[in-house]
Amino acid sequence: MMQDLRLILIIVGAIAIIALLVHGFWTSRKERSSMFRDRPLKRMKSKRDDDSYDEDVEDDEGVGEVRVHRVNHAPANAQEHEAARPSPQHQYQPPYASAQPRQPVQQPPEAQVPPQHAPRPAQPVQQPVYQPQPEQPLQQPVSPQVAPAPQPVHSAPQPAQQAFQPAEPVAAPQPEPVAEPAPVMDKPKRKEAVIIMNVAAHHGSELNGELLLNSIQQAGFIFGDMNIYHRHLSPDGSGPALFSLANMVKPGTFDPEMKDFTTPGVTIFMQVPSYGDELQNFKLMLQSAQHIADEVGGVVLDDQRRMMTPQKLREYQDIIREVKDANA
């Protein structure tokens, strides 16, 4: 907002200065044209004066005026007689005297003066007489008009320069050093995991309960805690549980009397770490899943219920090794 106000002040000050200069030139030309209109009448009356009086008239006309004198061939007695007469020149002096102070400061003689004297080819032209003394009073009427104008001009550019100070050329940005990549932190090793397999019927079918019960018992599972089947260290059910088998359908429990029972599949899971060698327990778990799938006519799936692949089996083994290393 302040910069907008400063720009407005600068523009207003410049317009004021231009208006003053145009007005001064216009006034000067107007006064000069009026002086040239009055001068022929004065010259007609000054022809009767002698050469000495003509020089006095030149002093009254101001700086840089060109005077044209006609050679006077009259007798000397006639000149003396004319010199005794009162000079009519003083009757026309006030108009010139009043017009001189209104001339502009340091106005050089323009080229318009010689064409006005051109119609008199037979008259000799004298050199212009420069009188510096009248210059001092000529500056007085002009100074009060020009002096107040520069005040807003000198005060306004100072904040304008300050406004453009931020526009200084900015040094080219130095290339930033490339940060070295931070060392990749090793993923923290897991200390426990759950290995999951599924035995499911083919698409659109279900596993028969009686057939499923026989295959589960043949694989060494025993019905126990949480109403699900567990595979213990010993086939007779003694020792710690190595892995367990649950129903794929929530809540995941079984009924031991499931002759009329059907299900889309069962889930076998093993918690790692576990008792004994986890890799050996995993092999036993995979063998049990394949035995049940073969007996009921199903397929073995991974934890995402996709077809089990050798890559997925290696992934399970890597997880088991990672947990073992973390708990070593």
From Swiss-Prot:
**Can you cite a GO biological process for this protein?**
FtsZ-dependent cytokinesis
Low complexity: bias regions: 99-115, 123-171
Role = Essential cell division protein that stabilizes the FtsZ protofilaments by cross-linking them and that serves as a cytoplasmic membrane anchor for the Z ring. Also required for the recruitment to the septal ring of downstream cell division proteins.
Tell me what this protein is called.
Cell division protein ZipA
Instruction: Note whether Signal occurs among the keywords.
Output: no
Q: Which residues lie on this side of the membrane: Cytoplasmic?
A: 28-328
User: Where in the cell is the protein located?
Assistant: Cell inner membrane
The protein's topology relative to the membrane is: Single-pass type I membrane protein
The subunit field of the Swiss-Prot or TrEMBL record says: Interacts with FtsZ via their C-terminal domains.
Q: Which residues form a coiled coil?
A: none
- Region Disordered, as annotated, extends over 42-186
Asked if Transmembrane is a keyword of the record, the answer is yes
A Gene Ontology cellular-component term: cell division site
Record gene name: zipA
List the Periplasmic topological domains. Answer: 1-6
Where primarily located? membrane
- To which species is this protein native? Shigella boydii serotype 4 (strain Sb227)
Family recorded in the similarity comment: Belongs to the ZipA family.
Keywords, comma-separated and alphabetical: Cell cycle, Cell division, Cell inner membrane, Cell membrane, Membrane, Transmembrane, Transmembrane helix
Where along the chain is composition biased (Acidic residues)? 51-63
Q: What's the domain of life for this entry? A: Bacteria
| TM region positions | 7-27
Q: Name the Pfam families on file.
A: ZipA_C
